[in-house]
Design a protein with these regions (language model features):
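N-terminal Rossmann-fold cofactor-binding loop
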Residues: 12-18
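Rossmann-like NAD(P)(H) cofactor-binding subdomain of soluble oxidoreductases
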Residues: 18, 23, 27-28, 37-114
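Short acidic-hydrophobic, aromatic-tinged amphipathic segments that line or gate anion-handling sites
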Residues: 31-37, 140-142
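Internal alpha-helical scaffold of NAD(P)-dependent oxidoreductase catalytic cores
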Residues: 87-97, 113-150, 161-199
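Short pre-catalytic strand/loop immediately N-terminal to key active-site residues, enriched for Gly-Thr
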Residues: 98-99, 147-152, 204-209
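NAD(P)-dependent Rossmann-like dehydrogenase/reductase catalytic/cofactor-binding core
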Residues: 187-251
């Protein structure tokens, strides 16, 4: 969503596999180049690699970054789970201005959630970055100490939401609905329910109670989910993801 909202000359893509970079550039209407070219000319350098690959990539880019640091300042933007801003700076070999962000996959449609923190970024550059990111969805500044927890909820959460949609659709099929209809109903229900939470400001428990009529069908489903430890399972999933994210930063 961000790339599609930017001008054709404002985004330069790079990938260790040139064919992938070219295909994505063609899809988004952007230019593509090498990692060194990105490091040499871009104002915001997005580091979109896995944590275990970050050190090697930055080691290759260090000479380019050092050469331009004084004449043309830049901001490093990291999306690597578990790696702190301090770790990224150590890998890059200097205390460059840095933004750490945790997006999720719905940013592709402009309905994502991005938590971010920054260090030593000039206010005008921060404002520029926020404007560029706005088409991706909601943005929220958080202390770096909360980034990993935020990632466990909104970064990993879409996978669990898809599991829930699939499970609801399975139930609908078991009850006689065609698969396509059951999936559509489940997805739209989750979308609308999320909007109810965000736009009404009401507690999810209050909204849940409003659907549960005394002696009705919904409360029976709620009762069964409670018996099967639905809440506990979801909470444990978040904590498991949180612990794994922290482990990534230790390796």
């Amino acid at each position: 969503a961000v790339c599609k909202g930017a001008g054709a000359g404002d985004v330069l893509l790079a990938n260790r596999t040139p064919a992938k970079a070219q295909a994505l550039a063609d899809e988004l209407g952007c230019a593509c180049g090498t990692n060194e070219e990105v490091a040499g000319i871009c104002d915001f350098i997005f580091l979109g690699v896995k944590p275990q690959m970050m050190a090697d990539m930055l080691d290759e880019l260090t000479p380019t970054l050092e050469a331009r640091a004084e004449s043309r300042p830049f901001v490093l933007v990291t999306m690597a789970a578990g790696l702190s801003m301090q770790q990224i700076r150590q890998m890059a070999g200097s205390g460059y201005p840095i933004i750490r962000m945790m997006p999720n996959t719905p940013v592709a449609l402009g309905d994502g959630m991005i938590q971010y923190c920054s260090d030593d970024v000039e206010p005008e550059k921060m404002a520029e970055w926020l404007t560029a990111m706005a088409p991706a969805g909601r943005l929220d500044a958080v202390p770096e100490s909360l980034i990993d927890a935020a990632s466990a909820v909104s970064g990993c959460g879409p996978a669990w939401a898809y599991q829930f949609i699939e499970a609801l659709a399975d139930g609908g099929v078991a009850a006689g609905l065609p698969r396509a209809k059951a999936q559509e109903y489940a997805a739209q229900m989750l979308l609308g329910s999320a909007r109810m939470v965000l736009e009404t400001g009401k507690h999810p428990g209050e909204l849940k109670d409003a659907v549960c009529s005394p002696g009705g069908s919904t409360i029976q489903g709620v009762r069964l989910l409670e018996e099967r430890a639905f809440r506990g399972a979801v909470t444990d999933a978040v904590l498991a993801a949180f612990e794994k994210t922290k482990d990534l930063g230790k390796k």
